[in-house]
Amino acid sequence: FPRLEERQHQVASTLSGGEQQMLAIGRGLMSRPKLLLLDEPSMGLAPLLVKEIFNIVKAINQQGTTILLVEQNANMALSIADYGYVLETGRTVLHGPAQELAANEEVKAAYLGG
């Protein structure tokens, strides 16, 4: 997280939303977990920062950490996921490989704006 290195002496509460998300992810990685749980990492972020956060999440996964991602931005989540679950009122209504879910007409119509 090069951006955080530049701000290493800054109080966390004064960081931008994206920087705070990077800090939270970094703190979660400090114990070298096998599984990292992320709840809405894109919430409240500008689109450019959302893309950056998702690139970071993808890189963490590619380095061997399993990621459980809860995310309203279904397009972005499915673009980096291996597998996905679609929940409605707390129940799993669909699941499968992320590419299949992204191509599913029901999923497109209901969740992907298409």
PLM region descriptions:
Residues 25, 45:
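Hydrophobic anchor residue at the start of the ABC signature
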Residues 11-15:
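Conserved ABC ATPase signature
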Residues 28-29:
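ABC ATPase C-loop
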Residues 83, 95:
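Short, glycine/charged-rich "phosphate-handling" switch motifs in NTP-dependent
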Residues 36-40:
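Catalytic Walker B motif of ABC-type/P-loop ATPase nucleotide-binding domains
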Residues 51-63:
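Helical segment within the ABC ATPase nucleotide-binding domain
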Residues 32:
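Conserved catalytic motifs of ABC-family nucleotide-binding domains
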